[in-house]
From Swiss-Prot:
GO biological process, one term: mitochondrial respiratory chain complex I assembly
Protein's name in the database: NADH-ubiquinone oxidoreductase chain 2
Native source species: Civettictis civetta
Xref: Pfam families: NADH_dehy_S2_C, Proton_antipo_M
Gene from which this protein is expressed: MT-ND2
Function: Core subunit of the mitochondrial membrane respiratory chain NADH dehydrogenase (Complex I) which catalyzes electron transfer from NADH through the respiratory chain, using ubiquinone as an electron acceptor. Essential for the catalytic activity and assembly of complex I.
Amino acid sequence: MKPPILIIIMSTVILGTMIVMTSSHWMLTWIGFEMNMLAIIPILMKKFNPRAMEASTKYFLTQATASMLLMMGIIINLLHSGQWTVSNNLNPTSSILMTTALAMKLGLAPFHFWVPEVTQGISLSSGMILLTWQKIAPLSVLYQISPTINPNLLLPMAILSVLIGGWGGLNQTQLRKIMAYSSITHMGWMTAILLYNPTMMFLNLIIYITMTLSTFMLFMINSATTTLSLSQTWNKAPLITSLILTLMLSLGGLPPLSGFIPKWMIIQELTKNEMIILPTFLAITALLNLYFYMRLTYTTALTMFPSTNNMKMKWQFENTKKMIFLPPLIITSTMLLPLTPMISILD
């Protein structure tokens, strides 16, 4: 893809998300979603092979269905209230339709089936955009309508997402699918806290985006797409491989890394709201994610795959590509836990 075209498309993706986040009119919100969806499809098809085309088609069909449900909810709310203003006094029927539509856009269970398939069929850079930037717009609308969301609809979705995100990643060897199931799990944690402390959801989102961006950038540097290819990078670029493993443990929520912060604060907030069963279940199912990240860490760092070369390290390491934003992203992805007491605005 030529640079001028890529700049125009990326600008449209960013503009669509910004329109959704800043608009107070439901029609503008819907237009922002459509701009974002139509602009992201050429980015998903950047590789232009049958797998990428299939993934883009699946993404388009899912997002188009979600947009249709969203528009239906907007129209029902218009007929009920007589206004287009984005507010938190929605009609119950339109609230259910909008919540379902936004859950489809986010990839929450049981509407999660498209996320691993689409992520696996596209390039690492496209997958990075899909699993980070594309989550911002639906979550911002969920934040705006959170007072009217039915807990009996959203909480089962959150619990199912955490459970399926953990189970689905257990037998995966493809790194993109592992990241997709990790995304489903994190979306489940965010929607679980949405009804009790919406601001904490954005803290979780910021940390999740930081960790996912760092991990995908390191995958791109190593050109690693499977567990096998990742394990073979240890003797080429040991520093980068060790950083990937640290980031994966952070994504799994292992203390004392940054990924533990949102889990810790969400469990604390749910306990304050006299919810005992939900945080207990979330903490237990989080072990599924931590298990497959620990297993990936073990196979990559603590075992040596069969090789024709008996040398444990190459005499000259590969000259890897430089990424300017990578060092600060890695630092924030792994070392934020001591700063947790400073986050007093959420109390």
